[in-house]
């Protein structure tokens, strides 16, 4: 293959997380592993950091979130894409966080809760 290559060194990745951790303390830290870990394998990258305290993994699609869960990742996972009514049941099954960006999303969550008694953790996205 011709072109640039990027190498991920797990020890350096962990050191970078600890450097950030020294600045933010014990707050939760969101680590983006969407697009297959930007070509490095989402499960590979997530596995390196899964044992670190306070890590939330962020992906773009529910398929990526399910891939992490099925790959053994137990950390909290936030789906960046706008919540879709048709996959709310899977967010409960896989213990995923959703991104609500409109009143329509909140209404769908209320309806889902009224029908099932369950509701995923919600990240509210506001355009300012």
Regions found by a protein language model. Give the residues of each.
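N-terminal nucleotide-binding beta1-loop-alpha1 segment
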Residues: 21
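Gly-rich Lys/Arg/Thr-decorated short loops/hinges at beta-loop-alpha junctions or inter-strand turns
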Residues: 1
